[in-house]
């Protein structure tokens, strides 16, 4: 798969992951799908970071991809805590705070992933033009 397609894939998977958790009527099976997508996004974020480091892409893109991978790692930790609360019945203090942080990080991941995907695509196609 071309690098730009792979970078956009994480954006759409993150979007799908956010959407799955917002559909309450479909129940707990969507929580499992949400969790599975989280692990896929984690793997892709780290893979994208490694693959970007092998290119001549600007260092800024590499740094953003690295921070996205770090956020995805932290996101999984929060996700496991929330999963234990929702599916396993483990009582978690301040679960609302954890949920809010989980949401904020999800939005940061999708934003950063979109930024990297667009910038890499433009860099690869030499679409940058000097300002006048």
Residue map of PLM features:
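Polytopic transmembrane helical bundles with strong interfacial aromatic enrichment
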Residues: 1-132
């Amino acid at each position: 798969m071309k690098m730009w397609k792979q970078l956009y894939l994480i954006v759409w998977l993150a979007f799908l992951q956010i959407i799955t958790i917002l559909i309450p009527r479909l129940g707990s099976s969507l929580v499992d799908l949400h969790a599975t997508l989280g692990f896929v996004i984690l793997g892709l974020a780290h893979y994208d970071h490694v693959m970007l480091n092998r290119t001549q892409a600007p260092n800024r893109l590499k740094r953003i991809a690295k921070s996205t991978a770090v956020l995805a790692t932290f996101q999984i930790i929060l996700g496991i805590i929330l999963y234990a609360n929702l599916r396993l019945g483990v009582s978690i203090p301040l679960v609302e705070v954890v949920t809010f942080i989980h949401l904020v990080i999800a939005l940061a991941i999708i934003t950063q992933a979109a930024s990297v995907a667009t910038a890499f695509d433009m860099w690869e196609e030499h679409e940058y033009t000097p300002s006048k």
